[in-house]
Amino acid sequence: IGKFGQWYTDSDLVKQDTSALLLKNDLPEGDYRVDTYKIHDNIGMWLDKSCLQYFGSTAAPSILSFYPALGVKRDVRSEPELSNYALRGLLSVEYLITTPEKQTDFENEADDGWEYAFAKDGYAVYRNTNYVPMGFAYDYYLTQTEYEETAKATRANLLIRALVLTDEDAAVYGKYLTHLPEGRREELYYESYVQDCRER
């Protein structure tokens, strides 16, 4: 689940991994993903939680196409920047974990959607106030063509608001949803993202 420590960059690897095993019992129960900030890879595995920051030698083709479609680099490492705030709500990230030494850096870089939750087991934990539970439902849809016309940097915002259907699927299933009005495809700001998360 880990890797061999390297003398300078990984000197605290064992400590972080064993602390994560303790933190596993102190995290709130529930089905959610976690995110990490400037700590070692794959901490989520020790927590039995899916984690946005991940290193693995295999990845499903759908993941390798999903992330780049949102303007996020994805190869064997998943490491979306904090500036991709809408990705956290879209992928149901409820908690972010960092070390006390990195707290100030995180708070300076993060958007307003994070609140300090607690410190325990050598970690500082933040709660995503824009958390959207897994399995949320949609009221709106847009077509694949409309989706692809949107700037990559705002597509995660759009996916919080509407489901993407191929033209063929829209002809069959579009009757169950409302076609997203053109004006709502352009209001893709942080404030509108917060409202969209509340509506989910």
Where are these regions (language model features)?
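Extracytoplasmic
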Residues: 1-54, 126
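Residues that form generic nucleotide/phosphate-binding pockets
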Residues: 23-26, 66-69, 153
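Charged, low-complexity surface segments at secondary-structure and domain boundaries
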Residues: 2-11, 49-53, 69-76, 136-150, ...
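Flexible, solvent-exposed extracytoplasmic
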Residues: 87, 92, 98-200
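Active-site-proximal structural scaffolding
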Residues: 13-17, 27, 80-81, 89-90, ...
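Positions that flank functional sites
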Residues: 41, 59, 103
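Short alpha-helical segments and helix-capping/turn motifs at coil-helix boundaries
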Residues: 15-26, 79-84, 101-104, 111-112
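Luminal/periplasmic acceptor-recognition loop/helix of membrane-associated glycosyltransferases
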Residues: 52-91
